[in-house]
From Swiss-Prot:
InterPro entries membership: Metalthion_dom_sf (IPR017854), Metalthion_dom_sf_vert (IPR023587), Metalthion_vert (IPR000006), Metalthion_vert_metal_BS (IPR018064)
Residues covered by region (Beta): 1-28
GO-annotated molecular function: metal ion binding
UniProt gene name: mtb
Record family assignment: Belongs to the metallothionein superfamily. Type 1 family.
Residues where a divalent metal cation 5 binds: 33, 35-36, 49
Residues that coordinate or bind a divalent metal cation 7: 49, 54, 58-59
Protein name: Metallothionein B
Residues that hold a divalent metal cation 3 according to the record: 14, 18, 23, 28
Binding locations of a divalent metal cation 2: 6, 12, 14, 25
Pfam families reported in the protein's UniProt record: Metallothio
Keyword Metal-binding in annotation: yes
């Protein structure tokens, strides 16, 4: 299980159910969350997106 960190409003659960509501996370370890764009490359370490854009720091 690899939960998302939501420090702002909204709830993220990237466990088995994988549900995100009003996701405002700044770091999301699963690409199933809407705060990680669909075009974001999936890496072995998981997708880490800053904000709602996918840049060079998306996967690290």
């Amino acid at each position: 299980m690899d939960p998302c960190e939501c420090t702002k409003s909204g709830t993220c659960n990237c466990g088995g159910s994988c549900t995100c509501t009003n996701c405002s996370c700044t770091s999301c370890k699963k690409s199933c969350c809407p705060c990680c764009p669909s075009g974001c490359t999936k890496c072995a370490s998981g997708c880490v997106c800053k904000g709602k854009t996918c840049d060079t720091s998306c996967c690290q």
